[in-house]
A protein has these predicted regions:
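Exposed, interaction-prone extracellular/peripheral surfaces
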Residues: 1-33, 49-54, 63, 72-85, ...
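A short glycine-rich, His/Asp/Glu-containing loop-to-beta-strand
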Residues: 58-60
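A positional/architectural concept
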Residues: 38-41
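Small-residue-rich anion-binding loops in enzyme active sites
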Residues: 43-45
Length: 294
């Protein structure tokens, strides 16, 4: 089932937000993010000693007159970042009355919009089974985004997803921006290899875990018949009492804590969001506090 989640009014309200990148930026010239490498922009960064073969037009003759030594001016290189967004389209993302799929699309669309507002490239992929489906491919600029936004609303959710198996064989870039994984991470299939792979490629990794209100704080009590949304062959008949609810909460804390710790150890960002959170709360609150947005 596809989710109609985004409207133009919402995108206009988030236009002023800017994404904050932690790692060095490298890529095609044209974007307006400053990397920590040196290049040919007009913004002065530092000096270094002149060596034979250097461009003499970059010599600082004032420094030579003062120190009787040749110094080369270094400038910040402004390069284009490529934001790559991966959306888990497994059946658990749309299970029951959950709004996880809708939230995933809104977060993906907002991050993509903020990126194109900065003239960065954006690609959006759907994780389906063990492969990626490219929804938006390397667009630059707001006009291109507006022309492609309908594709996000047409994403179909269902089936399984294998995050690592899908991402590892794909082209992920190297040191050229942010990689965002949006999922409920409620799967027996591993995601760790994907995070490690992206981090090793010097990408700024940002994992967003979306859970429904019921998953975060289940209110069900008494006899229940539970169905595994990721495996239709698994069902559970339980009597849910106070102790079961307490054990569930402990298990949930373990799962979310494990992802958080795994990301932190790799200098990756991790966000736990409720499907019922307003996107304004997520972007104007949580992501600003985390330093992902400024």
């Amino acid at each position: 089932m596809s989710i109609k989640a985004i409207n133009e009014e919402f995108l206009q309200q988030v236009e002023s937000l800017q994404m904050l990148i932690k790692n060095n930026v490298a890529g095609l010239f044209g974007g307006n993010r400053k990397s920590k490498t040196f290049g040919s922009s007009c913004e002065f960064a530092d000096y270094r000693d002149y060596v034979a073969g250097d461009d003499i037009t970059k010599l600082d003759w004032n420094a030579y007159a003062r120190f009787d030594k040749l110094y080369l001016k270094l400038y910040l290189d402004e390069r284009q970042m490529h934001t790559r967004i991966y959306i888990d389209a497994s059946r658990s993302m749309e299970y029951g009355k959950s709004k996880k799929a809708e939230q995933a699309i809104k977060i993906a669309a907002t991050l993509a919009y903020l990126s194109v507002c900065e003239m960065d490239k954006v690609s959006v992929y759907v994780i389906r089974e063990k492969s990626l489906e490219e929804v938006i491919s390397g667009i630059v600029g707001k006009e291109a985004f507006i022309s492609n936004i309908h594709k996000l609303n047409e994403i179909e959710f269902g089936g399984d997803s294998y995050i690592s198996d899908a991402i590892l064989p794909s082209k992920v870039g190297h040191g050229d921006g942010m990689s965002v994984i949006i999922s409920d991470f409620l799967t027996d299939n591993d995601y760790e290899r994907a995070i490690d792979h992206l981090a090793n490629k010097k990408r700024h990794v940002f994992c967003t875990q979306i859970l429904s209100r019921e998953e975060l704080n289940p209110l069900t009590r008494g006899k229940v018949h539970l169905f595994d949304s990721e495996n239709i062959n698994k069902t559970y008949r339980k009597h849910v009492d106070k102790e079961i609810a307490k054990a569930y909460k402990a298990a949930l804390n373990y799962v979310t804590g494990k992802i958080n710790d795994f990301c932190a150890a790799r200098n990756a960002d991790y966000l736990l969001a409720s499907a019922e959170d307003s996107v304004f709360e997520i972007f104007f609150g949580k992501l600003v506090e985390m330093g992902v947005l400024k």
